[in-house]
Design a protein with these regions (language model features):
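Helix-loop-helix hairpins and the membrane-proximal interhelical loops
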Residues: 1-53, 164-167, 201-283, 426-428
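Loop-to-helix transition at the N-terminal end of transmembrane alpha-helices
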Residues: 47-66
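Internal alpha-helical transmembrane segments of multi-pass membrane proteins, especially GPCRs
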Residues: 55, 104-107, 249, 287, ...
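Electropositive phosphate-/nucleotide-binding environments in soluble metabolic enzymes
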Residues: 16, 20, 32, 36, ...
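Membrane-embedded alpha-helical modules
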Residues: 95-210, 214, 325-434
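Helix-loop-helix junctions within the multi-pass membrane cores of secondary transporters/permeases
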Residues: 2-39, 60-61, 70, 80-141, ...
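Helix-capping/transition residues at the boundaries of transmembrane alpha-helices
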Residues: 43, 71, 188, 296, ...
């Protein structure tokens, strides 16, 4: 077994081992397990069979994540995107589009992804993105992850009175537990304790029981629901209606840029990027991501995408695809033991996201602050990822501004021709938001 794992995942080449990869894989699983509570609930509220959706989500995560592991040897885990899930729910509940046609739109989005990914167009776009913007994407994702963690535990909350973000209830048990675990994480990192992230999550989960933060499940074992109601329940012909083009664009463009941003961000965290900010073998990651979206549509599940929480496994020492093989195994067990993992409170996973997000801000030091045409678009990328609460929004604002500033400053030669096409796509994306 050891020789097989070494041959497939090249553990010694990446300076890792089976134990480290296992701990990292479990860490990734714990930080993204919330998807099992959110996606089935969201689609269930839209009229889909919640039990069937839960089974489909688990199986898709396992299959697509393991495909990523074996095909790319990268520690990237996939799951249904919450943004695309929200769009699909809106299509069904607000626009009156049937779940079958919504699945058809998702499928067409995936086919479009497959076409541009296997033709190498997606990789070409990434290569022409300026180095400063690539580093800005990594930093922006870091802030996005940190804010996501802070909001999930209630440390940061939206104030209706002030119409802005502010501190939540600092006296709440969730916030107190979150802050204590964050300090605990700093301690285990300073002391370099193996498995420190998992240990801190476990301690916080147990500590949350007497405080009422950790809700004990009423049962331990669950059984997978049948997928008869959703499998191949798809209307591709009906989805070809031109009226659905805005929804196709709304699914396609954000996922395109979010995936590119996530892969580069997590890749930077893992030390995979070359001196130009490119990720070797990124086309394989895109290909898996693209095929996964179309496969997911066959189950009525929104766009499968690479998850930011993969960075938690990287922080725990994960270097290869073996990391997410263990993530996949953990999710597979959830077909029968989902109540156990769903008891882990957000107060236990939020500090992990905050810690990782802070670490990813290190990418900002690589931005050229002596050239306004470089640092201004980079700032907008980082800022609007947070201000507009979306990775794609930050990227789609930064690219047109970069091109415009280079044109105004007379630095036309620094603009790759493909950047004009990418700029047009970004503008098209914002038109769909109007």
């Amino acid at each position: 077994m050891g020789k097989y794992l070494e041959k497939v995942f090249r553990l010694s080449q990446y300076g890792t081992n089976l134990k480290t990869e296992m701990i990292a894989g479990i860490t990734t699983f714990v930080t993204m397990a919330y998807v099992l509570a959110t996606v089935p609930n969201m689609l269930g509220n839209a009229g889909l069979n919640k039990s069937a959706v839960m089974t489909a989500v688990i199986l898709l995560i396992v299959i697509t994540t393991c495909a990523m592991a074996f095909y790319t040897n990268r520690p990237f885990a996939l799951a249904p995107g919450l943004g695309s899930t929200g769009i699909v729910v809106s299509m069904i509940t607000n626009e009156g589009i049937s779940p079958e046609k919504a699945a058809g739109v998702i499928f067409l989005s995936g086919i479009l992804f497959i076409a541009i990914s296997f033709l190498g167009l997606r990789e070409a776009v990434v290569k022409v993105i300026p180095v400063s913007l690539k580093h800005a994407v990594s930093a922006g994702i870091g802030l996005f992850i940190a804010l996501l963690g802070a909001k999930s535990c209630g440390l940061i909350a939206a104030s209706e009175k002030k119409n802005c973000l502010t501190f939540g209830d600092l006296r709440s048990p969730e916030v107190i537990l979150c802050l204590i675990e964050f300090c605990l994480m700093l301690l285990v990192k300073i002391k370099n304790i193996p498995g420190g992230i998992i240990l801190s999550i476990l301690i916080t989960t147990i500590a949350g029981i007497p405080l009422g933060v950790t809700k004990l499940p009423d049962r331990i074992i669950s059984f997978p629901g049948k997928m008869d109601d959703i499998f191949l329940n798809i209307d591709i012909k009906g989805a070809l209606n031109t009226a659905y083009i805005p929804f196709l664009i709304a699914l396609f463009i954000p996922d395109f840029f979010s995936t590119f941003g996530t892969v580069l961000g997590v890749g930077a965290k893992a030390g995979y990027l070359d001196e130009k900010g490119n990720l070797p073998g990124i086309e394989k990651c895109f290909q898996v991501d693209a095929v996964s979206t179309s496969v997911g549509a066959l189950f009525g599940i929104p766009s499968m995408t690479t998850y930011l929480e993969s960075s938690a496994g990287v922080e725990a020492g994960g270097k290869t695809g073996l990391t997410v093989i263990f993530t996949g195994i953990c999710f597979l067990l959830m077909l029968f033991f989902s109540p156990i993992v769903l008891m882990i409170p957000t107060a236990a996973t939020a500090p992990v996201l905050i810690y990782i997000g802070i670490h990813m801000l290190g990418a900002m030091k690589n931005i050229d602050y002596s050239d306004m045409t470089e640092y201004m678009p980079a700032f907008l990328c980082i800022g609007f990822t947070i201000f507009a609460n979306n990775i794609a929004n930050g990227i789609c604002i930064a690219i047109p501004v970069y091109v415009l500033m280079k044109l105004i400053s007379g630095k036309v030669k620094e603009i790759q021709p493909v950047m004009y096409i990418v700029t047009a796509i970004c503008i098209l994306y914002f038109i769909t938001l109007i």
